Amino acid sequence: YQVTQDTTPICTEGFVRIKDAQGKDKRINLTRIHMEEDSGKSIHDIDPFNTLVDLNRAGIPLLEIVSEPEIKNGEEAYSYLSEIRKLVRYLEISDGNMEEGSLRADLNISVRKKGTTKFGTKVEVKNMNSFRNVQKAIDFEIIRQIDLIEGGTPIFQETRTFDAVKNCTIGLRTKEDAHDYRYFPEPDLVPVIVSASYVDEVR
């Protein structure tokens, strides 16, 4: 199992500024930033038939940054991750090396018709460990979903992985709804309320 802050994140809102395809400033708003316990690293690009699990980082705390659904394509995602890496390196909280597992990305991708506001069914591509593969996975998944919809095939909520050899996503499992994750309080970690006066005292 994985320990997560879930409903009590470190912070909410905020934004990351990127350059869009036209070189213009674009603001990607953040939903929240919260702490989690790293439970392991899935490796999909070594064995074409099996997913390997690296447990060297199990138990190490990680910081999850959740963005609003405002990234339009793979190029913007690449720019967004580049800015995140600059930030964590500047703050000296991580080396930001994706290939070593210090920075990873889970992608939630959906498409919708132009002019509509309702999002389509999202598909998650997990544990991406390369900026370039993130870009390729998003652009592939956008085309795949559009082709399915135009062909009259519904999109199912599922978890997929990216095949770096074939440059395509592959289905892993159907996605559970949030209430099926079986969240429950961790009895060894009691809630800690940090007051403003305590923060001032520590400073």
Summary of predicted features, one role per range:
Residues 1-203:
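Basic, nucleic-acid-interacting segments
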